[in-house]
Amino acid sequence: MTSWIDSDAPVFFDTDCLGCFLWTSNLLVLRRLLDGRIRIPEEVVIEIMRRRPRSSRGYSVGMAQGDLRQFVSTGKAAVVCMELGSKQHDEFHRLVKGEFWGKRLGRGESAALAHARFAPGIAASNNRGDIVPYCRSYGLQWITTTRMMVDAVSSNRLAFEEARHMWERMVQEERRMPYPDFQSAWDSDARPEVETAATLDRPLNEE
C-alpha cells in the first residue's frame, strides 16, 4: 500500500487532529505536507467556529478561527459537505448514534470517517481508540499527528528541529500528545500507523 505521504488520496481531518496544527499556528506546515489534499468536513469547521473567543496559551481562539477562514478562502484546504440522503450522510448519522460497535463518536470524527470511506480517502485523527475499529472493518487508511510528523522528518520534508518546536507548541497549547516531546516520539516509533484491516493483526494499543 502506498504511504500516505506519497499518495494522492485526500486526507479528511477530524477536529482534534486539525487542531494540533491550527491552535499552534502551523497550518502552512500542514499544507507543505499535503498540498491539494487537505479536506476539512463542514462539521469540523462548525465545531471550531463555535469555540468561544478567549485567550489560550499565547494563541487566541479568535486568531485561530481567522487563520482557518483564510486557509480555506485562499484554496489551501477544501471544506467538504454531505448531501442529505447521501451515503456519507447516512454513515455519519450511524456513527454519531453509536450504531457501529455501540460506541457514539463525535461529529468531527464521524464526518472524517464517513468521507474517508466513500470518497475514498485517508482519515486523520488522534483518537485511535475510536477510529481504528472502523478503519479495520472497512480497510481504510488512517494517520495521526505523530505519524505525519515522524514521516515528514523521515522523508526530509520537515526538519527535525522544526518538528521539535512544533511539538513543544502543541504541548503548550494543551493538545493531548502521546509523548512529552518529539524526540520521544521519534525514538519510540517502530512501525507505520497507516494500516488496513488486511495488514493489522495485533491487539489495539491507544497512543
Feature annotation, model-predicted:
Residues D151-A159:
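Short, flexible loop segments at boundaries between secondary-structure elements
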Residues T2-G121, V132-P133, R164-E168, M177-E207:
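Active-site-proximal, substrate-binding regions of enzyme catalytic domains
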Residues R37-R39, L140-M149:
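Short hydrophobic/aromatic-enriched beta-strand-loop microsegments
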Residues G129-V132, V150:
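Positions that flank functional sites
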Residues Y138-Q141, A159-F160:
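Short low-complexity, flexible loop/linker segments enriched in glycine and/or proline
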Residues A123-N126:
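Acidic beta-strand-to-loop metal/phosphate-binding motif
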